């Protein structure tokens, strides 16, 4: 019934080649993946959450297909915005970075995002950054000037290949300041001097701190090697960040590629507008978690294909919540059978959808087909298979990991509904029915409906859920 992992071909859209390609790791049965993580100076917004959720699903799928997966997602803990936030608060930058790194982990955990295998901090790899810069200077791909180290863009003929931009677009798009010490307007900073009150490290070019782009190149080299299988991140990082990473690493490693596959998720938009602080339409993850279960926020992010822009809305989040109600309702309908989901429990059609460039909308359609069958199936053996398939498929998406009753009574219940009060009213209704006071039983059912609660009477008692 189910596809064997070693027979399933994973196809991924490679930004570098502008096409879908069959993915095979460089080393058989071992995959290396790096995803750009947060710059920790503020709370995470829904745009930060999208790559975390998307690449969490990819990591789950890779672990299903390959024996050994090494997934690294970094923490950028030295950057001008962090320095500014620390100065404004009158504290050391470590106070800011540790606080917001912790909040980021908590928020992502609430969305069901598993911790990466490696979570390197930029400040832990300063020595590796300096070593890489020294190599780039020695090869003529970088130069020192007035306490800065800059990458010599004209020295790398392939610069612009990842983003597909021409030279003028790249300079304008990066908003590169044409400082007098630059040999070329497109050259970008690898190292910059620090003032006495700014954080800094000693280097051959004086006390200073790294530029953003060199950080990821050095962390990848340190933890995963010169060439990795997959490099991921948001489409906003494609240029200049990823373009610069590619250039630095390629030149530092004798023109070997930094990554064999480059994957980028699309923007999160607020209606027809791009989400941005200047427009005042940024949605913070912790605010969304006060409105809906983390699992619903996660499903709303997976409801669109990862490469497409995602138009975020309250209705989209409410729809994701209703979808989970249906799926958990199907699991509740299967509560009378036991099933132990195995690694191959997810059905072929579901696995094929995920293996087709992580097509989560198509995979969800398969999940809902299973749920529809679960609600009408009567054969115990088939019901057990359906239950295993639902849980096994849900596990790959990072959903359906709760007990259905816990979902409807707790996480899945609307925040305004008092679960204890619902249970008290159901007990009173049951007592009224037992006493044959059907008018009172109907009155209580109506009161529950007004609260937004639907009840279902079954052979094992009365269950309830939030009404759709």
UniProtKB/Swiss-Prot annotation:
Q: Keywords for this entry?
A: Aminoacyl-tRNA synthetase, ATP-binding, Cytoplasm, Ligase, Metal-binding, Nucleotide-binding, Protein biosynthesis, Zinc
Q: Which Gene3D superfamilies match?
A: Cysteine-tRNA ligase, C-terminal anti-codon recognition domain, HUPs
This entry carries the following GO cellular component terms, namely:
cytosol
Gene Ontology annotations of biological process type:
cysteinyl-tRNA aminoacylation
Subcellular location per the Swiss-Prot or TrEMBL entry: Cytoplasm
The residues that the entry says bind Zn(2+) are 36, 216, 241, 245
Q: Which NCBIfam families match?
A: cysS
Indicate the quaternary assembly.
Monomer.
Q: Which family does it belong to?
A: Belongs to the class-I aminoacyl-tRNA synthetase family.
- Protein name, UniProt field: Cysteine--tRNA ligase
Species name: Parvibaculum lavamentivorans (strain DS-1 / DSM 13023 / NCIMB 13966)
């Amino acid at each position: 019934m189910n596809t064997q992992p070693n027979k399933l071909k994973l196809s991924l859209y490679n930004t570098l080649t502008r096409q879908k390609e069959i993915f095979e790791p460089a080393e058989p049965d071992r995959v290396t993946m790096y995803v750009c993580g947060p710059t920790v100076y503020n709370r995470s917004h829904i745009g930060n959450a999208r790559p975390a959720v998307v690449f969490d699903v990819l990591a789950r799928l890779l672990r299903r297909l390959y024996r050994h997966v090494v997934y690294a997602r970094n923490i950028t803990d030295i950057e001008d915005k962090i320095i500014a936030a620390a100065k404004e608060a009158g504290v050391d930058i470590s106070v800011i970075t540790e606080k917001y790194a912790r909040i980021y982990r908590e928020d992502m955990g609430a969305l069901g995002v598993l911790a990466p295998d490696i979570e390197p901090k930029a400040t832990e790899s300063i020595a590796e950054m300096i070593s890489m810069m020294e190599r780039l200077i020695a090869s003529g791909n970088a130069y020192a000037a007035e306490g800065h180290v800059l990458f010599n863009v004209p020295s790398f003929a392939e610069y612009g290949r990842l983003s597909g931009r021409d030279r003028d677009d790249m300079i304008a798009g990066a908003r590169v300041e044409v400082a007098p010490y630059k040999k070329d307007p497109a050259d970008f900073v690898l190292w910059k001097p620090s003032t006495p009150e700014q954080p800094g490290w000693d280097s051959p070019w004086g006390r200073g701190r790294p530029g953003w782009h060199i950080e990821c190149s050095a962390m990848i080299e340190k933890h995963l090697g010169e060439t990795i299988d997959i490099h991921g991140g948001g489409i906003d990082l494609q240029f200049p960040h990823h373009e610069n990473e590619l250039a630095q690493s390629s030149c530092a490693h004798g023109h070997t590629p930094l990554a064999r596959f480059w994957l980028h998720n699309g923007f999160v938009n607020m209606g027809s507008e791009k989400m941005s602080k200047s427009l005042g339409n940024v949605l913070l993850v912790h605010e969304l978690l006060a409105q809906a279960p983390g699992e619903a926020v996660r499903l709303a992010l997976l409801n669109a294909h990862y490469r497409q822009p995602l138009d975020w809305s309250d209705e989209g989040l409410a729809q994701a919540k209703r979808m989970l109600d249906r799926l958990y309702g199907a699991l509740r309908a299967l509560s009378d059978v036991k099933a132990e989901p195995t690694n191959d429990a997810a059905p072929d059609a579901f696995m094929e959808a995920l293996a087709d460039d992580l097509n989560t909308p198509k995979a969800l359609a398969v999940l809902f087909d299973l749920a529809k069958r679960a609600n009408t199936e009567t054969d115990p053996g088939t019901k057990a298979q359906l239950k295993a398939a639902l849980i096994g498929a849900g596990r790959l998406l990072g959903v359906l990991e709760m007990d259905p009753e816990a979902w409807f009574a707790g996480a899945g219940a609307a925040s305004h509904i008092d679960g204890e009060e619902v249970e008290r009213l159901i007990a009173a209704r049951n007592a009224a029915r037992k006493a044959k006071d059907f008018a009172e039983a109907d009155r209580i059912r109506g009161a529950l409906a007004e609260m937004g609660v639907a009840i279902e009477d079954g052979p094992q008692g009365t269950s309830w859920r939030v009404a759709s």
